[in-house]
């Protein structure tokens, strides 16, 4: 394949950084453009110390700035779009999430058409498929089953509509007369080193005598390691650039999981952290149906107060459903079309993540020592 270039949005994020680490190992890649609204100084330094001859261009800009996006896409061969706001708690205003996740994706697609970028890979989410009810049971689901989230909550709704826009754009004519090829990847819940969600869980537990706060004990999920999700993006980029593979990939979506055992979210957190003395909360939990209707009441209160006060419920029906459902998916289609096999085994993923949790524990101890002096 001739020399090529790649733009990665959300490159400063949890998944984006891992994609960059794998991209620098790709043959014939001449330039990587890393785009985010703001990069932490340590992330910038990491990009400049990748030890590669590939040109790395750091771009800070707003995904809602259409002119900026068009300039960022000039001369690019592949766009990997991971930039998104992930929030299932209701903390971030709805319009902000819709602007970034949906409008931002639409802006980027238009920039690709105007700049004649031939390949677009969208980091979607399993949330676009549901679960719609905690009563539903989906084990090893697959792409041939028609599953679509019916939630109006901003995160699943915005990701669903953004994915629809991406797949609908497949086959669009580019400004130079070429054709845009798109695909979407739907990873399961992602874990691994530097996961903000996992970090928050551990930090809360450190302040709670190493007791992990529960909430997902009734779930059955198949979480996926961040390194394997990043690998799937690399394979999708290769596939869309390969004339023999591309016809089977363009316009398609793929569930991305790995060989992490099916388990509850609580069990996953415990398995990854038990080496450092963490334990599960043994308290009694309300039955899921009661939690669900309590969430409905809290959402009603929030709605009634909205004209005069922004009340954010501690949990909502969507969150209860996510953490109480049996919802797992197979990666066989990605295996068939992309040649995807997990790059990192469950044992290795568990070890790497556990070691990282150990660094969080050490940082916490150092903070306590400093305060006690």
UniProtKB/Swiss-Prot annotation:
In terms of superkingdom, the source organism counts as: Eukaryota
* Compartments it resides in: Endoplasmic reticulum membrane; Mitochondrion membrane
Q: What is its main location?
A: endoplasmic reticulum
Tell me the residue numbers annotated for binding NAD(+). 159
Q: Which UniProt keywords apply?
A: Endoplasmic reticulum, Isomerase, Membrane, Mitochondrion, Multifunctional enzyme, NAD, Oxidoreductase, Steroidogenesis, Transmembrane, Transmembrane helix
State which Enzyme Commission number(s) the record gives. 1.1.1.145, 5.3.3.1
The catalysed reaction is:
a 3beta-hydroxy-Delta(5)-steroid + NAD(+) = a 3-oxo-Delta(5)-steroid + NADH + H(+); a 3-oxo-Delta(5)-steroid = a 3-oxo-Delta(4)-steroid
Its pathway, per UniProt, is: Lipid metabolism; steroid biosynthesis
Q: Which SUPFAM superfamilies match?
A: NAD(P)-binding Rossmann-fold domains
Q: What does this protein do?
A: 3-beta-HSD is a bifunctional enzyme, that catalyzes the oxidative conversion of Delta(5)-ene-3-beta-hydroxy steroid, and the oxidative conversion of ketosteroids. The 3-beta-HSD enzymatic system plays a crucial role in the biosynthesis of all classes of hormonal steroids.
The protein here is known as: 3 beta-hydroxysteroid dehydrogenase/Delta 5-->4-isomerase type 3
Originating species: Mus musculus (Mouse)
